[in-house]
């Protein structure tokens, strides 16, 4: 229970940091914090080339010269899911709401819930999405190997695979 509360506090802290931080004074000569205000970035509809069902991606931050990671909040409606994919450097998912499912190729489906953190190592084929009866939102953090390259998309997860058959 303490672990769950700690993880939930971490998730809330990440969202609060992204959405409510005070302004910074960044000059061209001095490195400093960059503040990206909650709601500044336009949500993206998940493409059917990469997702099954209704998925919304809310970009949180992009990789830049000082940092190779990028992050986004991804919301899956019930039954929606990613296609199979791999990350060249790995991925961290922080589930912030709902109930979801994730699976590594050749292994059983795992249920994930708000407060759970999923650490997917580099080059592990997997998928993730909402459970059949619940929406699910997670924060995804990935690292680029080259500009814009954080994922290699593969084939869709079939309905039979999603059902665990």
Task: Give the predicted meaning of each segment.
Residues 1-4:
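Positively charged n-region of N-terminal signal peptides that target proteins for export
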Residues 8-22:
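Bacterial N-terminal signal peptides
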Residues 24-68, 150-165:
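A short, N-terminal "cap"/entry segment at the start of jelly-roll beta-barrel domains
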Residues 56-57, 70-87:
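Conserved short histidine dyad/triad with adjacent acidic residue
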Residues 59-61, 75, 103, 111, ...:
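Generic structural detector for well-ordered beta-strands
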Residues 68, 86-87, 106, 130-132:
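Short glycine/proline-enriched turns and hinge-like loops at secondary-structure junctions
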Residues 81, 86-114, 124:
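A short beta-strand-loop-beta hairpin characteristic of the jelly-roll/cupin
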Residues 101, 108-109, 113-114, 122-150:
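Ligand-binding loop in jelly-roll beta-barrel domains
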């Amino acid at each position: 229970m303490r672990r769950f509360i700690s993880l939930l506090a971490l998730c809330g802290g990440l969202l609060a940091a992204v959405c409510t931080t005070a302004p910074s004074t960044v000059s061209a000569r001095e490195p400093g914090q960059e503040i990206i205000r909650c709601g500044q970035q336009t949500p993206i509809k998940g493409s059917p080339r990469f997702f099954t069902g209704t998925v919304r991606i809310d970009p949180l931050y992009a990789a830049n010269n000082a940092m190779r990671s990028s992050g986004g909040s991804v919301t899956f409606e019930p039954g929606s899911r990613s296609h199979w994919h791999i990350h060249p450097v790995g991925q961290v998912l922080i589930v912030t709401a709902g109930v979801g499912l994730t699976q590594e190729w050749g292994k059983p489906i795992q249920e994930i819930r708000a407060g759970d953190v999923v650490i997917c190592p580099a080059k592990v084929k997997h998928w993730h999405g909402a459970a059949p009866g619940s929406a699910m939102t997670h924060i995804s953090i990935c690292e680029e190997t080259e500009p814009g390259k954080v994922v290699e998309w593969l084939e869709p997860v079939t309905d039979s695979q999603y059902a665990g058959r």
